[in-house]
Amino acid sequence: MQENLSDCDVLFGVKEVPIQDLIPSKTYFFFSHTYKQQPYNAKLLRACVERNIRLIDYELLKKNGNRVVAFGRFAGLVGAYNGLRGWGEKYGQYALKPAHECRDMQDMFDQLKGIDWPADLRILLTGKGRVASGAVETLVASGIPQISPEEIAGYEGCFWSQLDVEHYYKTNDGRPFDRKELFADPSGYESDFMRYVPFAKLYIAGHYYDSRAPFIFTRADAKLQDFAITYVADISCDIDGPVASTLRASTIADPFYGYLASEEKEVRHDDPEAIGVMAVDNLPCELPRDASLSFGNELMTHVIPALFDGDKDHIL
Protein backbone atom coordinates (compact mmCIF):
# COMPACT_ATOMS: atom_id res chain seq x y z
CA MET A 1 0.00 0.00 0.00
CA GLN A 2 1.21 3.51 -0.78
CA GLU A 3 -0.32 6.96 -0.67
CA ASN A 4 1.65 8.43 -3.58
CA LEU A 5 -0.21 7.42 -6.75
CA SER A 6 1.58 9.78 -9.13
CA ASP A 7 3.26 6.93 -11.03
CA CYS A 8 -0.02 5.08 -11.66
CA ASP A 9 -1.74 5.31 -15.04
CA VAL A 10 -5.12 3.87 -14.00
CA LEU A 11 -6.85 4.44 -10.66
CA PHE A 12 -9.87 2.45 -9.46
CA GLY A 13 -12.36 3.83 -6.95
CA VAL A 14 -15.96 3.13 -6.04
CA LYS A 15 -17.89 6.28 -5.11
CA GLU A 16 -17.04 9.83 -6.23
CA VAL A 17 -13.42 10.89 -5.76
CA PRO A 18 -13.13 14.19 -3.84
CA ILE A 19 -12.20 16.96 -6.25
CA GLN A 20 -9.11 17.92 -4.23
CA ASP A 21 -7.79 14.36 -4.60
CA LEU A 22 -8.06 14.14 -8.39
CA ILE A 23 -4.63 13.73 -10.02
CA PRO A 24 -4.29 15.38 -13.46
CA SER A 25 -3.87 13.31 -16.62
CA LYS A 26 -4.92 9.97 -15.12
CA THR A 27 -7.59 7.43 -16.04
CA TYR A 28 -10.15 7.01 -13.26
CA PHE A 29 -12.79 4.34 -12.79
CA PHE A 30 -15.59 5.16 -10.33
CA PHE A 31 -19.31 5.79 -9.99
CA SER A 32 -19.37 9.53 -10.76
CA HIS A 33 -23.15 10.09 -10.65
CA THR A 34 -22.86 12.59 -13.49
CA TYR A 35 -24.12 10.92 -16.66
CA LYS A 36 -27.75 11.80 -15.89
CA GLN A 37 -26.58 15.41 -15.54
CA GLN A 38 -26.93 15.37 -11.77
CA PRO A 39 -26.38 19.02 -10.82
CA TYR A 40 -24.76 18.24 -7.47
CA ASN A 41 -21.76 16.66 -9.24
CA ALA A 42 -21.32 19.22 -12.02
CA LYS A 43 -18.19 20.56 -10.31
CA LEU A 44 -16.68 17.09 -10.21
CA LEU A 45 -17.20 16.59 -13.94
CA ARG A 46 -15.81 20.04 -14.67
CA ALA A 47 -12.72 19.30 -12.59
CA CYS A 48 -12.11 16.11 -14.58
CA VAL A 49 -12.21 18.08 -17.82
CA GLU A 50 -9.96 20.83 -16.50
CA ARG A 51 -7.40 18.31 -15.24
CA ASN A 52 -7.31 16.26 -18.44
CA ILE A 53 -8.71 13.22 -16.66
CA ARG A 54 -10.18 10.26 -18.51
CA LEU A 55 -13.23 9.34 -16.45
CA ILE A 56 -14.73 5.88 -16.98
CA ASP A 57 -18.00 5.49 -15.11
CA TYR A 58 -18.91 1.96 -14.07
CA GLU A 59 -22.57 2.69 -14.86
CA LEU A 60 -21.72 3.02 -18.55
CA LEU A 61 -19.62 -0.15 -18.92
CA LYS A 62 -21.77 -2.59 -20.89
CA LYS A 63 -21.45 -5.81 -22.84
CA ASN A 64 -24.26 -6.75 -25.21
CA GLY A 65 -26.31 -3.93 -23.71
CA ASN A 66 -25.98 -5.16 -20.13
CA ARG A 67 -23.94 -3.51 -17.40
CA VAL A 68 -20.88 -5.51 -16.37
CA VAL A 69 -20.14 -3.82 -13.02
CA ALA A 70 -22.95 -2.91 -10.66
CA PHE A 71 -24.00 -2.93 -7.03
CA GLY A 72 -27.71 -2.85 -7.86
CA ARG A 73 -28.48 -6.33 -6.61
CA PHE A 74 -27.05 -5.53 -3.19
CA ALA A 75 -28.86 -2.21 -3.02
CA GLY A 76 -32.07 -4.14 -3.63
CA LEU A 77 -31.26 -6.86 -1.10
CA VAL A 78 -30.55 -4.40 1.69
CA GLY A 79 -33.14 -1.81 0.67
CA ALA A 80 -36.03 -4.26 0.90
CA TYR A 81 -34.70 -5.55 4.22
CA ASN A 82 -34.42 -2.01 5.55
CA GLY A 83 -37.98 -1.31 4.44
CA LEU A 84 -39.22 -4.30 6.42
CA ARG A 85 -37.05 -3.29 9.37
CA GLY A 86 -38.27 0.32 9.27
CA TRP A 87 -41.91 -0.77 9.20
CA GLY A 88 -41.38 -2.95 12.25
CA GLU A 89 -39.62 -0.16 14.11
CA LYS A 90 -42.21 2.50 13.27
CA TYR A 91 -45.20 0.41 14.30
CA GLY A 92 -43.55 -1.67 17.03
CA GLN A 93 -44.77 -4.93 15.51
CA TYR A 94 -41.44 -6.77 15.30
CA ALA A 95 -37.70 -6.02 15.45
CA LEU A 96 -34.94 -6.79 12.94
CA LYS A 97 -31.21 -6.45 13.42
CA PRO A 98 -29.64 -3.76 11.18
CA ALA A 99 -28.22 -5.26 7.99
CA HIS A 100 -24.76 -3.82 8.66
CA GLU A 101 -24.63 -5.78 11.91
CA CYS A 102 -25.20 -9.05 10.04
CA ARG A 103 -22.14 -11.08 9.09
CA ASP A 104 -23.27 -11.53 5.51
CA MET A 105 -26.29 -11.86 3.26
CA GLN A 106 -27.28 -15.26 4.64
CA ASP A 107 -27.19 -13.92 8.18
CA MET A 108 -29.45 -11.07 7.05
CA PHE A 109 -31.90 -13.54 5.51
CA ASP A 110 -31.86 -15.57 8.72
CA GLN A 111 -33.19 -12.53 10.62
CA LEU A 112 -36.40 -12.79 8.58
CA LYS A 113 -37.18 -16.32 9.68
CA GLY A 114 -39.90 -16.79 12.23
CA ILE A 115 -41.33 -13.26 11.94
CA ASP A 116 -45.10 -13.15 12.31
CA TRP A 117 -45.76 -10.64 9.55
CA PRO A 118 -48.79 -8.44 10.27
CA ALA A 119 -51.82 -8.83 8.03
CA ASP A 120 -51.73 -5.16 7.01
CA LEU A 121 -48.16 -5.40 5.66
CA ARG A 122 -49.11 -5.14 1.99
CA ILE A 123 -46.13 -4.38 -0.21
CA LEU A 124 -45.68 -2.90 -3.69
CA LEU A 125 -42.31 -3.19 -5.45
CA THR A 126 -41.61 -1.24 -8.64
CA GLY A 127 -38.92 -2.30 -11.10
CA LYS A 128 -37.59 -5.36 -12.91
CA GLY A 129 -33.85 -4.71 -13.08
CA ARG A 130 -30.92 -5.62 -10.84
CA VAL A 131 -32.15 -3.53 -7.93
CA ALA A 132 -35.65 -4.97 -8.01
CA SER A 133 -34.27 -8.49 -8.45
CA GLY A 134 -32.25 -8.05 -5.27
CA ALA A 135 -35.36 -6.82 -3.47
CA VAL A 136 -37.23 -9.89 -4.71
CA GLU A 137 -34.59 -12.15 -3.15
CA THR A 138 -35.18 -10.54 0.23
CA LEU A 139 -38.96 -10.67 -0.08
CA VAL A 140 -38.83 -14.33 -1.06
CA ALA A 141 -36.59 -15.01 1.95
CA SER A 142 -39.17 -13.29 4.17
CA GLY A 143 -41.80 -15.88 3.34
CA ILE A 144 -44.40 -13.18 2.66
CA PRO A 145 -46.77 -14.41 -0.10
CA GLN A 146 -46.30 -12.98 -3.59
CA ILE A 147 -49.35 -12.14 -5.68
CA SER A 148 -49.80 -10.75 -9.18
CA PRO A 149 -50.70 -7.08 -9.74
CA GLU A 150 -54.12 -8.23 -10.96
CA GLU A 151 -54.86 -9.82 -7.58
CA ILE A 152 -54.01 -6.79 -5.44
CA ALA A 153 -57.43 -5.12 -5.20
CA GLY A 154 -59.27 -8.15 -3.87
CA TYR A 155 -56.55 -9.74 -1.77
CA GLU A 156 -56.86 -9.97 2.00
CA GLY A 157 -53.85 -10.28 4.28
CA CYS A 158 -50.13 -9.76 3.95
CA PHE A 159 -48.59 -9.84 0.44
CA TRP A 160 -45.99 -8.41 -1.89
CA SER A 161 -46.45 -7.70 -5.58
CA GLN A 162 -43.99 -6.61 -8.24
CA LEU A 163 -45.04 -3.90 -10.69
CA ASP A 164 -43.34 -3.41 -14.05
CA VAL A 165 -43.57 -0.25 -16.16
CA GLU A 166 -46.83 -1.29 -17.82
CA HIS A 167 -48.43 -1.40 -14.39
CA TYR A 168 -47.35 1.99 -13.06
CA TYR A 169 -47.29 4.00 -16.32
CA LYS A 170 -49.95 4.52 -18.98
CA THR A 171 -50.27 6.63 -22.11
CA ASN A 172 -51.68 10.09 -21.55
CA ASP A 173 -54.17 9.87 -24.42
CA GLY A 174 -55.56 6.35 -24.04
CA ARG A 175 -53.56 4.74 -26.86
CA PRO A 176 -52.12 1.23 -26.27
CA PHE A 177 -49.08 0.96 -24.01
CA ASP A 178 -45.82 0.55 -25.94
CA ARG A 179 -42.79 -0.45 -23.89
CA LYS A 180 -40.24 0.56 -26.53
CA GLU A 181 -41.93 3.92 -27.00
CA LEU A 182 -41.90 4.56 -23.25
CA PHE A 183 -38.17 3.93 -22.99
CA ALA A 184 -37.40 5.97 -26.10
CA ASP A 185 -39.58 8.95 -25.19
CA PRO A 186 -41.60 8.86 -21.95
CA SER A 187 -43.12 12.31 -22.51
CA GLY A 188 -46.34 10.73 -23.80
CA TYR A 189 -46.91 8.80 -20.58
CA GLU A 190 -48.26 9.49 -17.10
CA SER A 191 -48.23 7.66 -13.80
CA ASP A 192 -50.80 4.93 -13.22
CA PHE A 193 -49.39 3.97 -9.82
CA MET A 194 -52.28 5.44 -7.86
CA ARG A 195 -54.65 2.63 -8.88
CA TYR A 196 -52.72 0.31 -6.54
CA VAL A 197 -52.10 2.75 -3.70
CA PRO A 198 -55.42 2.27 -1.83
CA PHE A 199 -54.57 -1.41 -1.31
CA ALA A 200 -50.94 -1.17 -0.12
CA LYS A 201 -49.05 0.05 2.94
CA LEU A 202 -45.34 -0.37 2.16
CA TYR A 203 -43.85 0.79 -1.13
CA ILE A 204 -40.37 -0.35 -2.19
CA ALA A 205 -39.02 1.77 -5.07
CA GLY A 206 -36.60 -0.38 -7.05
CA HIS A 207 -37.12 1.01 -10.54
CA TYR A 208 -34.70 2.87 -12.82
CA TYR A 209 -35.90 6.42 -13.28
CA ASP A 210 -35.45 8.46 -16.45
CA SER A 211 -35.58 12.17 -15.64
CA ARG A 212 -37.88 12.68 -18.65
CA ALA A 213 -40.45 10.25 -17.24
CA PRO A 214 -43.45 11.17 -15.07
CA PHE A 215 -43.12 10.97 -11.29
CA ILE A 216 -44.41 7.76 -9.69
CA PHE A 217 -46.37 9.74 -7.12
CA THR A 218 -46.35 13.46 -6.36
CA ARG A 219 -46.67 15.50 -3.19
CA ALA A 220 -50.26 16.22 -4.18
CA ASP A 221 -50.94 12.49 -4.56
CA ALA A 222 -49.60 11.83 -1.05
CA LYS A 223 -52.21 14.22 0.38
CA LEU A 224 -55.17 12.34 -1.11
CA GLN A 225 -57.52 10.55 1.25
CA ASP A 226 -57.09 7.19 -0.51
CA PHE A 227 -53.28 7.36 -0.37
CA ALA A 228 -52.92 4.36 1.95
CA ILE A 229 -49.15 3.92 1.76
CA THR A 230 -47.62 4.66 5.16
CA TYR A 231 -44.04 3.57 4.49
CA VAL A 232 -41.64 4.06 1.58
CA ALA A 233 -38.30 2.31 1.10
CA ASP A 234 -36.79 4.31 -1.74
CA ILE A 235 -33.86 2.23 -2.96
CA SER A 236 -33.54 4.32 -6.13
CA CYS A 237 -33.22 7.44 -3.95
CA ASP A 238 -33.74 10.21 -6.51
CA ILE A 239 -33.93 13.28 -4.29
CA ASP A 240 -37.07 15.41 -4.65
CA GLY A 241 -38.04 13.39 -7.70
CA PRO A 242 -40.34 10.54 -8.73
CA VAL A 243 -41.03 9.42 -5.15
CA ALA A 244 -42.34 12.55 -3.45
CA SER A 245 -41.54 11.51 0.12
CA THR A 246 -37.79 11.34 -0.55
CA LEU A 247 -36.65 14.77 0.59
CA ARG A 248 -33.05 13.73 1.22
CA ALA A 249 -30.80 10.71 1.40
CA SER A 250 -30.47 9.08 4.80
CA THR A 251 -27.50 7.26 6.29
CA ILE A 252 -26.69 3.76 7.46
CA ALA A 253 -26.34 5.10 11.01
CA ASP A 254 -29.66 6.96 10.82
CA PRO A 255 -31.64 5.33 8.00
CA PHE A 256 -35.19 6.46 8.70
CA TYR A 257 -37.16 9.70 8.83
CA GLY A 258 -40.75 10.80 8.46
CA TYR A 259 -42.51 12.72 5.69
CA LEU A 260 -45.56 14.75 6.71
CA ALA A 261 -47.55 14.91 3.49
CA SER A 262 -49.95 17.61 4.68
CA GLU A 263 -47.08 20.05 5.18
CA GLU A 264 -44.59 18.56 2.69
CA LYS A 265 -41.82 18.48 5.27
CA GLU A 266 -39.57 16.12 7.17
CA VAL A 267 -40.60 15.08 10.67
CA ARG A 268 -39.64 12.39 13.15
CA HIS A 269 -39.80 8.80 11.96
CA ASP A 270 -42.19 7.90 14.78
CA ASP A 271 -44.64 10.73 14.05
CA PRO A 272 -48.00 8.90 13.80
CA GLU A 273 -49.15 11.17 10.95
CA ALA A 274 -45.98 10.73 8.90
CA ILE A 275 -45.10 8.42 6.05
CA GLY A 276 -42.01 6.50 7.14
CA VAL A 277 -39.06 6.91 4.76
CA MET A 278 -35.94 4.79 4.21
CA ALA A 279 -33.66 6.50 1.70
CA VAL A 280 -30.12 5.27 2.36
CA ASP A 281 -28.03 5.96 -0.76
CA ASN A 282 -25.12 3.57 -0.07
CA LEU A 283 -27.05 0.41 0.75
CA PRO A 284 -24.48 -2.13 -0.56
CA CYS A 285 -22.08 -0.93 2.14
CA GLU A 286 -24.27 -2.73 4.67
CA LEU A 287 -23.22 -6.07 3.18
CA PRO A 288 -19.53 -5.34 2.52
CA ARG A 289 -18.39 -8.96 2.51
CA ASP A 290 -20.79 -10.07 -0.24
CA ALA A 291 -20.83 -6.80 -2.21
CA SER A 292 -17.03 -6.50 -2.32
CA LEU A 293 -16.60 -10.10 -3.48
CA SER A 294 -19.16 -9.62 -6.25
CA PHE A 295 -17.71 -6.27 -7.33
CA GLY A 296 -14.17 -7.66 -7.44
CA ASN A 297 -15.26 -10.65 -9.49
CA GLU A 298 -16.98 -8.40 -12.02
CA LEU A 299 -13.90 -6.18 -12.32
CA MET A 300 -11.58 -9.15 -12.81
CA THR A 301 -13.90 -10.80 -15.31
CA HIS A 302 -14.84 -7.85 -17.50
CA VAL A 303 -12.83 -4.68 -16.85
CA ILE A 304 -9.23 -5.62 -16.05
CA PRO A 305 -8.88 -7.81 -19.18
CA ALA A 306 -10.15 -4.95 -21.35
CA LEU A 307 -7.15 -2.85 -20.28
CA PHE A 308 -4.77 -5.43 -21.75
CA ASP A 309 -6.56 -7.00 -24.73
CA GLY A 310 -7.23 -3.81 -26.66
CA ASP A 311 -10.80 -3.75 -25.36
CA LYS A 312 -11.85 -6.38 -27.90
CA ASP A 313 -15.38 -6.52 -26.46
CA HIS A 314 -15.75 -2.71 -26.63
CA ILE A 315 -16.53 -2.41 -22.94
CA LEU A 316 -14.41 0.67 -22.28
Regions found by a protein language model. Name each.
Residues 1-8, 16-17, 163-227, 262, ...:
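A structured beta-alpha segment of the ubiquitous adenosine-cofactor-binding alpha/beta core
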Residues 3-5, 20-23, 47, 114-118, ...:
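Solvent-exposed alpha-helices and their adjacent loops that cap or buttress functional pockets
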Residues 3-6, 12-13, 55-58, 125, ...:
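General beta-strand structural signal in soluble alpha/beta enzymes
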Residues 10-91:
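Phosphate/diphosphate ligand-binding glycine-rich loop within oxidoreductases
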Residues 24-56, 202-262:
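ADP-ribose/adenylate-binding Rossmann-like module
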Residues 54-111, 231, 236-316:
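Adenosine-phosphate binding glycine-rich loop
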Residues 95-199:
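Glycine-rich phosphate/diphosphate-binding loop of Rossmann-like nucleotide-binding domains
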